């Protein structure tokens, strides 16, 4: 992966407050990384946003249930009460200079890592954001780096969607809860991503760029490659092996 060039990083010195004005969505990999880096339980930093639907057919790709009811949830980074109606991220550090810095920068969620860049088709664009006008000049950033990073992020959200779908099939057999309890879901995530990490470290470093690029090819077509039959996928050795490892980790093997 290419190193990020700090000299062209518009976030340095910015006071626009994305760390106190936005809810940050979390994928399972985010939860696993932060919990392991800080040696804390996910319940310390994960909050749950509720979305009621009429049936399970209306679930979004990242929505999970806890029982047979139609109530669904998705994970966001917890916040604390701030001033002026702001809700700073639980990990935001307020400096004497009135600047804000991330307390978990090396383990920050992938949504934070990519903000405010995204793909529009095959192009990288700056999506509407809290950033000052003109802060992100795409002629001055390393687009090769960002293409790989955004491809990696696409992959992690696809894996999360696959993990959530597997969980939802599991809990459809459970009776409706009398009291909400998110701990079983969080434990499921930690177990899956711990198994997946054992496989992740076995992927050759030089193989990742190709895997992310191929993943992006699928997600650009609104396809999660984990939902395809193996014969429909790519025959490249690292790609095929990685997909197999993900499926095995989610299945509990």
Residue ranges of model-derived segments:
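Short loop/turn segments that flank or connect secondary-structure elements
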Residues: 1-253
